[in-house]
Amino acid sequence: DWGFLEKLLDQVQEHSTVVGKIWLTVLFIFRILILGLAGESVWGDEQSDFECNTAQPGCTNVCYDQAFPISHIPYWVLQFLFVSTPTLVYLGHVIYLSRREERLRQKEGELRALPDKDPRVERALAGIERQMAKISVA
């Protein structure tokens, strides 16, 4: 659903400073671009170029596995996860803030809909406004 992604990016823009917006975008794109460009040449098919010193069938696979016991693909996936983790953590924080803000707005609407102006309701509304001020960047 593209609507979720659009809402998430709008929230990121709302909760970021100008420097943060540029930093997040450039750094994430740069990291993924470098990883994608370097990934093929660094973690490409090395086994086809590997030569075995005997003509025995299956020797190339056994020799390659002996020389390189761990596949390069898990390293590439691990690096991709490490590269994207800071951005994903920030996006998770933005999702948390937007949901918290949504709950506070809903609670505020429910309290404002009450017919009586009870002092407890006024205090609760003031508390919600303070919490909303903490969430807002502006």
Swiss-Prot record:
GO cellular component: connexin complex
Membrane spanning residue stretches: 17-39, 75-97
GO BP terms, alphabetized: cell communication
Extracellular face residues: 40-74
Entries under Gene3D superfamilies matching the protein: Gap junction channel protein cysteine-rich domain (1.20.1440.80)
Cytoplasmic side: 1-16, 98-138
Keywords associated with the record: Cell junction, Cell membrane, Gap junction, Membrane, Transmembrane, Transmembrane helix
Membrane-topology annotation of the record: Multi-pass membrane protein
Family: Belongs to the connexin family. Alpha-type (group II) subfamily.
Subunit structure: A connexon is composed of a hexamer of connexins.
Function statement: One gap junction consists of a cluster of closely packed pairs of transmembrane channels, the connexons, through which materials of low MW diffuse from one cell to a neighboring cell.
Name of the molecule in the record: Gap junction alpha-4 protein
